[in-house]
Amino acid sequence: MPYEIKKVFASLPQVERGVAKIIAGDPKGNNFLYTNGKSVIIRNIDNPAIADIYTEHAHQVVVARYAPSGFYIASGDTSGKLRIWDTTQKEHLLKYEYQPFAGKIKDIAWTEDSKRIAVVGEGREKFGSVFLWDTGSSVGEIIGNIKVINSVDIKQTRPYRLVTGSDDNCCAFFEGPPFKFKFTMSDHSRFVNCVRFSPDGSRLASAGADGQIFLYDGKTGEKVCSLGGSKAHDGGIYAVSWSPDGTQLLSASGDKTAKIWDVAANSAVTTFNLGSDVLDQQLGCLWQKDYLLSVSLSGYINYLDKNNPAKPFRIIKGHNKSIQCMTVDKSDGRSTIYTGSHDGHINYWDAETGENNTFTGKGHTNQVSSMDLDGSSQLITCSMDDTLRYTNLISKDYSSSESVKMDVQPKCVAVGSGGYVVTVCIGQIVLLKDKKKVFAIDSLDYEPEAVAIHKGSGTVSVGGADGKVHLYSIQGNSLKDEGKTLPAKGAVTDLAYSPDGAFLAVTDANKVVTVFSVADGYSEHNSYYGHHAKALSVAWSPDNEHFASSGMDMMVYVWTLSDPDTRIKMPDAHRLHHVSSLAWLDENTLATVSHDACVKQWTVTFK
């Protein structure tokens, strides 16, 4: 293969305030599962940088769970589709697909023999279904709740019991198979968010928005106690997870804490305070082997430390909204990837280990549209919040003084030498020097979309929606229109100079990449055809001979300058999502980012 995936830095869980987030464990204890958009993300619990992504759902996926055998995963989406797929092969072949009801699937449970499956959620005519995994034949009826069912679990020992938790403040208890409704437990005074049997089936825990956790006998459904007396948490409880030996219970709450409960003593033995910000609310949790995980409203996954409850020993960070732009810094001998997302977050990643973090302080408040490095430890970014920011890469801290307010919304930014920066805004081109606006061109007869600066000559190329590249030159503190335009094949979406400055590559909305020769007075060198939809981004390899382009067709092409027919096609680079930006780490390693909020690295080999 001329290309292969080298690393996947996965997205965070997609979270919503006031809604429980399920992170599910692996029966073998190696991985954990969660969802974001149309993707199911499988991550290694020991080393979260190892990740696998499943993207075969046509709609947003809500929940995914391993079968107890470990060989299959069932995942459910907002349309009510349930897909059961193979975990043993990279292709994740589909085994079965069902539509138990029309509406959002909110939770899934398997029997311990991996033969029966229960699915609950927001159906139109019913809120749940339980059936054989291989034929879809019904093995009972889920009744007893009169509102949306949020949670379901099946006792993992015989005789089987099934329980559901609903927005009608009740849990429904079933015996089977075939599963028959026995009674409702109406102890909660608010929505029931989570119901879970202990591993040996002796106990059942239910957690609700009233801040209470009730324990029941797993076999009979009789109430045993309320954990912590009248209140287990000061806020709603979104998730509970049993310890492997069933003696303790982990709970996650909107009061920004997680707690470990000693079930026999009916008391909290450890309380983890995870912050004071609203984004520190805890929406999900998982106890697997010796690991205790919780999910914050920020999307961060916390590895809780029993010995130091005040501070998680690891926090998985990243993006959970679409990534719009990226750049790579190779200055200190190792590669750092910078990414900016739709919600204004900027992350920096160690390209080797996947360790990442965000800048401290208050940064952009809206989509980060474009970014570039100035070669002296500064990242320059522009955003839909109408600002241009200079962020110091050594302190990694946003400073309010380093923000430049624009008259209109900026779209793209490019850095030249000598402290010059050019940004294109809606109907405007702005020149900045040493963090100050020094010149602007307002009366344009075209809409500027993208910009690149030739590092040697200071020529500024501005790509327009009129299908042309307009050339300007920096002269002192002003921009001079050179009166020359280059014809692209459609509205320009991105442009980039080769590292040696000899060529300019231009992508356009008509799926073409056009390369112009700088030395020949910007004459057209060649055109490169292959994309099936609008091309979005272009980046040159350090070897000056190859360049990569990405598009809305989910594809990445690696082109050869001297021969348009010699190309490497990477279909489904980010399946079901636009590939929004790319950058080269070295001559054989390409990094791509996408609306799936993931960062991928590819090893590209040339013949």
Curated annotation (Swiss-Prot):
GO terms for cellular component: actin filament; cortical actin cytoskeleton; cytoplasm; nucleus; plasma membrane
UniProt GO molecular function: actin binding; actin filament binding
Transmembrane parts of this sequence: none
Entry keywords, A to Z: Actin-binding, Cell membrane, Cytoplasm, Cytoskeleton, Membrane, Nucleus, Repeat, WD repeat
Main location: membrane
One Gene Ontology term from the biological process aspect of the record: sarcomere organization
Pfam families: WD40
UniProt repeat feature WD, residue ranges: 4-45, 48-87, 93-135, 138-176, 180-218, 224-263, 270-306, 311-351, 358-408, 432-474, 480-518, 523-561, 566-604
Family of this protein: Belongs to the WD repeat AIP1 family.
Protein name as catalogued: WD repeat-containing protein 1-B
